[in-house]
């Protein structure tokens, strides 16, 4: 008899196999580093958005050992799919000179910056074929060559204002992206390259009459009468999701919402 947790999980072509369908994080424990990072320096890379720099910290001494210039408004430092490069996402907020700066983790030094439109954040397709650049200002996901960052195709996400952070389904077929500025989550089909839907993070997600009364971000929330349920009130606080993570078995996603 074969136990359910011993049956291989069907994933998208090219994606590494899931070692344990009951715990997708099983291979991320202590002393389970990939051979690809064997020669990488043990460092912490911190983007300094206002200074347009990255500071490098030695965790053994807790001292800054280097600081170097990158592009305008660095937001995140993201390891590549093969773990051999770190990419700094410089989105140049409100400008047109966004870029990506590679860092060699073996030397801790930056390489040549590549011009890329509005890279607020970065992910990778589960098969490692594409870099997924989160173009927040344009409500768009740009799929690019993992080395040259040449644009290959885009997926528009018009209902996802402030698209930023994401996590993937355990089989690699879809991803959920948070929509920070309109309190929502967007589901993207990575196989067919389409948006499957967007849902508001609100107790009133299935009530358009109530959602229409929710305050826009930046507005002071208040309690107002519920138009659909006399005697009840609605808090107009909008959601502001920051991140999303899958449960170990991949059956549930947890959203970190700083407002609701």
Question: What positions do the PLM features span?
Answer:
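Predominantly soluble domains enriched in secretory-pathway, periplasmic, or organellar proteins
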Residues: 1-260
